[in-house]
Each structure stands twice: as structure tokens, then as C-alpha cells.
Amino acid sequence: MGQKVHPIGMRVGIIRDWDAKWYAEKEYADYLHEDLAIRKFINKELAEASVSTIEIERAVNKVIVSLHTAKPGMVIGKGGANVDALRAQLNKLTGKQVHINIIEIKQPDLDAHLVGENIARQLEQRVAFRRAQKQAIQRTMRAGAKGIKTQVSGRLNGADIARSEGYSEGTVPLHTLRADIDYAWEEADTTYGKLGVKVWIYRGEVLPARKNTKGGK
């Protein structure tokens, strides 16, 4: 089960929280499409800013967007010019008041999305897929990860038949629900077609917070 299911989706409500924090009844579809439009726009505008997670919260006529990025200076811009322009564009896109929070990622080598993005960009620059994966694994393990697994799929080295090849180091316990496993999937556009890049990073165990019951037990 743990090998097949999405590692983050399986842990939501246990050790992970939702990336979208809002509730709706009749407007659910509209909000969902708006969320997708916001995420697509931000990923396009900030493609070079190493943005990993985008969290969206909603209040009455207000949207709070939290950007987790390894390059906060690039997102903010000189004197806050870039973030102000982004806020204005999102206000126009949604027709609501958008607030942007910027959260710095202290260790980008422990973020699966950024590691996968780095491998994908190297593959686009014709770096050998084995070398790109092994270098990423070394950097992640040096950053303090307990384990990492990577996989690249597609027409590797321009081969006629697509295949998958992966490497791993340390342990990646996908069945253990308290294991803090970050997962990401990225695409690399090469001259031979698209290559898929998958990354699993095990960052250690997280013990779920105990819930208070009646009588304080």
C-alpha cells in the first residue's frame, strides 16, 4: 500500500496539513478552479525563484497565499517591487484582496520539489541522468536526510524504448505513517521528449501531537 499511494496524501491529517485551508459548499468548484489558476500563475511567474509549496487560505473576500521559497529576495524584489506587482496581478486574477506571505526554506536540499526541479533542469542541459541523480542524493544526505530515493523515467539518453532508472541511499519507510517523507514529481523537456523525475526524501520521524480528551487523559 505504502509503495503505491501518494506519500503526502496518505499522511494528511496525521503529520501533514492541507495546502488549501478553506471550506465551501456551493462555491467549492469555483474556489478549486481559482486555486488552480493561482498556483499555475505563481509557478509561471516565479519559475526561477525556487518556489516549493504554495498554501492558500480563504476568508470573506480575502485570499492569503503563503509561498515557501529558497530565494525570498528574488520573490520580494528591490524594495518589495516584485511582490507588490505579483499581489496586484493576483488581485486582478481573482477579483479579491490577496495577501502574500513569504516563508524562506532554510535547507533547499531537504525539499523534494526543489531537488526534483534541480535534477530536471540538469537533464534539460544534457547532464547524464545517473550523474544528476547521484549528485542530488549526495547533497541531500549531507544536508541531514535519513534517506532519499530518486527515479528518472522516459527515453533515457535518447533510447528508442522508454525505461525507468532510480537510485537510493539510506532508508525511505513509505509504510510508516509517522515518517516525515517529502515527495515530488517534476518533468524535464529534452530534445527526445519529456522525462519524469520522482523524488522521495525521508527527513526523520514526527510524533503526532496528542489530543486532549475528557478528564485530561
Swiss-Prot record:
Provenance organism: Streptococcus equi subsp. zooepidemicus (strain MGCS10565)
Protein family per UniProt: Belongs to the universal ribosomal protein uS3 family.
GO biological process, one term: translation
Keywords, sorted A to Z: Ribonucleoprotein, Ribosomal protein, RNA-binding, rRNA-binding
Domain of life where this protein originates: Bacteria
Assembly with partners or alone: Part of the 30S ribosomal subunit. Forms a tight complex with proteins S10 and S14.
Domain KH type-2: 38-106
Any one GO MF annotation of this record: structural constituent of ribosome
Pfam families assigned to the protein according to its UniProt record, in alphabetical order: KH_2, Ribosomal_S3_C
SMART domains: KH (SM00322)
GO CC annotation: cytosolic small ribosomal subunit
InterPro entries: KH_dom, KH_dom-like_a/b, KH_dom_type_2, KH_sf_prok-type, Ribosomal_S3_C_sf, Ribosomal_uS3_bac-typ, Ribosomal_uS3_C, Ribosomal_uS3_CS
Name of this chain's protein: Small ribosomal subunit protein uS3
